[in-house]
Amino acid sequence: MFDQLSLNILDIGMTSLAAGATALRITVIENTKRDWLVIRVRDNGCGMDKKTLRDILAKNTSTKAHRQKPIGLGLALLRQTSEMCGGVFHVHSIPRKGTGVTASMRVSHVDRPPMGDLNATIFALCAASPTVDIELNCESDGEKFHFSSQEGKYHEPRRTQETQGQGAAASCVA
């Protein structure tokens, strides 16, 4: 298990870039009243067939050709975190179309890792592949944040006293 959820997002995002994605959509939704956190990552990379997807989730196999040994723990670790924290994990992939990953979990679960530095995660993904269209959509108890690497701008949510002076995505899941 990664000690921050943003590292799970970074791992999946970097795998998407390695799979040839030209578009990467990341969504984080937190609803503390319903005690629910949802993370979605979708790409238009090479995708996987059902057998490969099953192998990756069951046997810790990697799709990266340069690996000498199969490891591929990224999806397995996020699935473990999601299920351990009372949530659901799902991956949908279509060859030559792309992959979508959804992980949900209880916000209040004692084992839920903190979000971590989501700003640094998005920056790293943009720096790793500046031509890829990377989009981040966050919602935390009704406050919304949107970033698009291709638009070159972001929309910052209305500030509350708690988030005043913090980073741009501060109100998007602590």
Locations of the language-model features?
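Conserved beta-strand-loop-beta-strand hairpin that lines the nucleotide-binding pocket
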Residues: 4-8, 14-72, 76-110, 136-141, ...
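N-terminal assembly/transducer modules of large multi-domain enzymes
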Residues: 107-159, 165-174
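Small/flexible residues
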Residues: 44, 160-161
